Structures are given as C-alpha cells and as structure tokens.
Amino acid sequence: MSKYHTYLQEIEDRKAEGLHPKPVDDAALLTEIIDQIKAPNHPEREASLNFFIYNVLPGTTSAAGAKAAFLKDLILGEAEVAEIDRASAFEQLSHMKGGPSIEVLLDLALGQDEAIALEAAAVLKTQVFLYEADTDRLAAAHEAGHAIATDIIKSYAQAEFFTNLPDVEETIDVVTYVAGVGDISTDLLSPGSDAHSRSDRELHGKSMFEHDTVRQNELLELQKQHPDKRVMLVAEKGTMGVGSSRI
C-alpha cells in the first residue's frame, strides 16, 4: 500500500475520534502527493492539492522541505500547476515558519531573475525565523555588493517585520476561562505523559485538563457562545511552574 493510501486510511480512523486529517510531516508522503498534483487526470488530484496547500506541517519537517522545493520550481517556471501561480507560491512560502522555506526565499532573492528576487525579498522582510546560516548568507551577499541583500538587511535593522504589522485594535473583547486554581503547572494544559502527541496539536488537545473531557467541552462551548471574542485561559496563581516552552 502506498504512503498516500495509508494516509487516507489514517484520516478515516481519525474521523472516528472526531479529529481532522493529521498534518503531513513526511517528505515521502508529500512527494506522492506532489506527483498526483502533476498528473492532470489523477482521481486524487483535487484532494492532493488541498493537502499540499493547507495541510503540510511547516518549519523544519522533511515535508516542509519538499513543499518549499516544489514551490521554488513553480516560481522559477520549472514546474507548472494551474491552481498555484507565482503569487500563491510566494504566499505559501511566507507562512512556512522558517527552515527550508527561508533557504528557498534566499535562493530566489539572491538569484539572477530580478523580478523574482524582488518578490522574494519582499517576503523575506516579513520573516522572523532566520538563523545564523541564513543571516550569514545575507551578510556575504551584502559584502559582495548585492543590492537586494543590502536592502533586506536594512529592512531588518529597521524592524520592518514588526513595524509593518497591522495596528493592534483599540478594543479587544475577551472572555476568560479559569483553567486551574492552586498549585498547578503547564502539565495541566500539556501533560508530559502525552508528549508524544505534541506535534499533532488536535490529538494533543484531547489531553488538556488531564484528559477531562467535561472541561474541554466547557471551553469549546464558551468559544461557541462568544464567536466575536477571544478565549483566554487564566490560571489564578501568582506563579506557574514552566519546565519547557509549553506555556
């Protein structure tokens, strides 16, 4: 059985638990999905497009690497998908939260096609997930006289990735849910015993409040009752023990 058909079976299994499809994090699975997108008459083409665009785990996963590489091919015209034009490809790269997407954006910004380089630079100026290897590439290009690299560095120096964000609303309506009272830690919301599921946020959510489904449903119901407000969890405690980045 192909990885794709195994994934479809997993989707059916998750439906029984009230879960949406798990985000794709495996490059081998995404490669099959991309191959199906490239085949105009493939029966799973539409589903594959949706998985590719909306359901690939971003960051440094192997699937993110495969997605970024394919988006680069689309931008350079080395591959073609009618539903993903150049603007759409850049938009998807902008939401991929670092890792291989930044590498691709730098390749394009420092490349030979000026129009593409300018578009890539505009996206890079909005990104915050750059690491030393990425900034080293920009520094080297700047020192070599690359004008676009210099422009990107100036943008970062002026913090345009922050100053160009939309203004915070004058008024923010919130509704609070007291998550716990007394001696608690982040284990209440993200139990260490369920650490294996943290990459699958929807599944991991079922462990909130120590697997207390009554309280989980109370929180979801609160959200339904106040669709125009933001739900804030409030731990009524002077300090909260934090042993990791879970908070």
Cite the ranges covered by each PLM segment.
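N-terminal glycine-rich anion-binding loops that anchor highly charged ligand groups
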Residues: 2, 41-44, 182-187
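Amphipathic alpha-helical packing elements
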Residues: 3-39
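Structural detector for internal amphipathic alpha-helices that build alpha-solenoid repeat scaffolds
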Residues: 19-23, 46-62, 76, 83-98, ...
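Well-ordered alpha-helical segments embedded in enzymatic catalytic cores
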Residues: 32, 70, 88-89, 218
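Generic amphipathic, hydrophobic interface segment in small proteins and small subunits
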Residues: 34-51
